[in-house]
Amino acid sequence: MENFPTEYFLNTSVRLLEYIRYRDSNYTREERIENLHYAYNKAAHHFAQPRQQKMLKVDPKRLQASLQTIVGMVVYSWAKVSKECMADLSIHYTYTLVLDDSSDDPHPAMVNYFDDLQAGREQAHPWWALVNEHFPNVLRHFGPFCSLNLIRSTMDFFEGCWIEQYNFGGFPGSDDYPQFLRRMNGLGHCVGASLWPKDLFDERKNFLEITTAVAQMENWMVWVNDLMSFYKEFDDERDQISLVKNFVTCHEITLDEALEKLTQETLHSSKQMVAVFADKDPQVMDTIECFMHGYVTWHLCDARYRLHEIYEKVKDQDTEDAKKFCKFFEQAANVGAVAASEWAYPPVAQLASVRAKSDVKEAQKPFLSSIELVE
């Protein structure tokens, strides 16, 4: 990849991992595979349903890849929640990734959004119809305050994706625009609130810690994602409306200056995340730390982010940052590099095909009247 600032990326990544004291020990290998398969299996059966297949209209390979990516993110990061909660969150966040990759204009289906919502009618937009159907399965795990954050943040995410349809990076001089859009489509509040299921936390007792965690996670989670995504998005035509690129446009600065701005804010947020919760409820701190470490492991190990390419490029270099990065990468790979064949089975397309054949056979059964049944 030409012109990619490899040395700068290595230095930034190393500082981030050192600040959060990266040491992912969330699972044994057996536990990780068990949780991955449980969440994947439930989510795969959900998306194999005829209604989901018909309304989403997503290429089977893309849906499969999206599901595997999200299951990995949830299982690696939400290490403290139940397997059932992991599965329901995996379904919800897969819906968000499907929307993020969509290029359909939402305007026509959103004309009567509030009227339909108020009247209790099914939403005209197929994504909202499906997400609303699944939402009760997600919200049952959380108290009312966390649930409201999940609902509100999901609505913000939809609006953020709507804005991104225009491939608009902001007007020069509009300094607030990049962070506005990133907060809108980052799902930070949804992620921050979904770490506290009611079977583990009393949201009234831990209200102050939870509220602060939601506030801190909003930036930390999306900024880390932006840093870890910078390599894969660097020369991808589909990823030109990123926070870094929008900094360049709106702040009228160079790409290096924009990356440095993101770097400093991410590192500051990481320091805050560790410092603020260091003397708070140990269970809260443990949950946050497990999330941060698992979230980093997921980025380093998931093929979507292509960070293994950086590793292969620099593993023989003798610089301090290269050696530290490779050590962290190998540490992550030792716990998180699990082949999809070990847990992501059967494929969604196969499950959907079986369901479709079963429905055809059911439809072909002879109809018997009540009189014939009696006879």
UniProtKB/Swiss-Prot annotation:
Q: Extract one GO BP annotation from the record.
A: sesquiterpenoid biosynthetic process
State the reactions this protein catalyses: (2E,6E)-farnesyl diphosphate = trichodiene + diphosphate
At the top of the EC hierarchy, this enzyme's class is lyase
- Which pathway does the record list? Sesquiterpene biosynthesis; trichothecene biosynthesis
Q: Which SUPFAM superfamilies match?
A: Terpenoid synthases
Top-level taxonomic group: Eukaryota
GO molecular function per UniProt: trichodiene synthase activity
EC number(s) of the enzyme? 4.2.3.6
Q: Which UniProt keywords apply?
A: Lyase
Please tell me what else the database record remarks about this protein.
Trichothecenes are sesquiterpenoid toxins that act by inhibiting protein biosynthesis.
Q: Which family is it part of?
A: Belongs to the trichodiene synthase family.
Protein function:
TS is a member of the terpene cyclase group of enzymes. It catalyzes the isomerization and cyclization of farnesyl pyro-phosphate to form trichodiene, the first cyclic intermediate in the biosynthetic pathway for trichothecenes. It serves to branch trichothecene biosynthesis from the isoprenoid pathway.
The protein depicted here goes by the name Trichodiene synthase
What species is given as this protein's source? Fusarium cortaderiae
**Name of the gene:** TRI5
